[in-house]
């Protein structure tokens, strides 16, 4: 990078996961970076006042690759704190049976990590860099007509304007940056609330001195009940972050905490013992219900400003790709800057076309996967097909890849390409299935004919 390029200034709005990684990535390339965040520093907030709308994260190949791209040593430090999950553990409605469904063809795992912990790790990494972080700064105005000027209201209620060469919005699904950027360009935009709520619950560590985990830590636990479900992901301290998902009508149809406990006794009997009746009652009365929303827009940049992560493509959490996809946004943008020899404006312009199909694909896939997690994981036909898919993957190695493998463990395969491959493989499986059924039918008719002839 030339001295002129390295002096370029970058303003980033949003110090969540994607904003922090973007700040680290730009700083690694030698740019002068300032990061703004509406909230106070989360590391200074009492942990008892943590956000109870936070679903645990599953870090997989795409997220890891992005972390390694920015700083391999940082990636290693973060990955020391994850818990590998080799598959799903399905809990039946009796509370007496559990079934493991492995994820990877070759023992691959996705990795559980607490969202707040990861965010704090990235903020700690930023403290070691030359990035300037300004908390309690609310964006109220953005102008990219010449230089990029952003106006903020700070913690003292004073207005401050800062000027940058380029600006980046990573401030989430309800992005103020996106709202202001839309005024500067022709951006298609839509948002859709999904008829689904989530309520965070907590499974405490076991009191067993020999094992702090009350259930298997190396699985993502699912209690599938068709139109609602419960999940649980392990934390390093032996606890599990558990989340109850349901249509709003289900949770709103429960009128009291005692009724909520009874609902759990009936639908998740083994989970009641893990969470505790008092904790369930308290959670129903006190914990907030989170909404699920999908956001889509296009293009993502006007050449001076760009949106990444949930600000550009908020998705439902059912494929575990929200954070992984946002981190991948950062890596792909950085690679475009490299390809264009440091020309950030050209990289911003190319980013939208390079990313759109993949972002549309994963948003749809995430929504579709709710049905798989809540219902299909106990369907015999689905399980037979998954077993065949897995077996073909083991036999034909890289010639046949299950969709989950491509999405979670093959960061070299774009999301849209993975779906194309899966559609082709489904056609092959369907044709093979029809062929097998046809052969069986012909065989049956022949045998019936032989039997009939013997009777004559």
UniProtKB/Swiss-Prot annotation:
Disulfide bonds: none annotated. It is found in: Mitochondrion outer membrane. Its main location: mitochondrion. GO terms for biological process: 'de novo' NAD biosynthetic process from L-tryptophan; anthranilate metabolic process; cellular response to starvation; filamentous growth; filamentous growth of a population of unicellular organisms in response to biotic stimulus; filamentous growth of a population of unicellular organisms in response to starvation; kynurenine metabolic process; L-tryptophan catabolic process. Pathway: Cofactor biosynthesis; NAD(+) biosynthesis; quinolinate from L-kynurenine: step 1/3. Belongs to the aromatic-ring hydroxylase family. KMO subfamily. Catalyzes the hydroxylation of L-kynurenine (L-Kyn) to form 3-hydroxy-L-kynurenine (L-3OHKyn). Required for synthesis of quinolinic acid. Transmembrane segments: none annotated. It comes from the Eukaryota. GO terms for cellular component: mitochondrial outer membrane; peroxisome; plasma membrane. Its EC number is 1.14.13.9. InterPro entries: FAD-bd, FAD/NAD-bd_sf, Kynurenine_monooxygenase. Its cofactor is FAD. Keywords: FAD, Flavoprotein, Membrane, Mitochondrion, Mitochondrion outer membrane, Monooxygenase, NADP, Oxidoreductase, Pyridine nucleotide biosynthesis. GO terms for molecular function: FAD binding; kynurenine 3-monooxygenase activity; NAD(P)H oxidase H2O2-forming activity. It catalyses: L-kynurenine + NADPH + O2 + H(+) = 3-hydroxy-L-kynurenine + NADP(+) + H2O. The keyword Mitochondrion applies. This is Kynurenine 3-monooxygenase.
